[in-house]
């Protein structure tokens, strides 16, 4: 609700001041965005609640960022979201963040994530959705919020305690380079990583 209200206001000039579903047109807000960036890591299915939690929402709400757990990759939900953005906001789309953690127990995890999400983007583009760019998060392992250097999400691995900051290309980085240079997902990667 909050995201939709903000996006509709800044893209279309339809301001829902009370978040009650009733918008007023504000010409001064129309066209404030040239494009929209979508940060996508995984989908979450939510269900309605009998009572709104909004009256209880407070700036003092305490969320522990250390409880973050990467969800299941559901690229069909990414494709659906892109369709909603296109239909609702009529703006060009950039995937401004998309990435997965390295999994030492599953060496194909990051590569599979990249292939499945880029395949979803290809399907969306084939349907006429105006996706103009894709940015993987992140190029190299980095300092993530309260997790420090423990989240290994980079195409290049890096030991944050190493004074030389030596980088090691991960398999997913090699594959992403092949995809970028060929302009498509290689057949072998499609066969290996797509259901």
Task: Place the predicted regions along the sequence by residue.
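Active-site region of glycoside hydrolase catalytic domains
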Residues: 1-110, 114-195
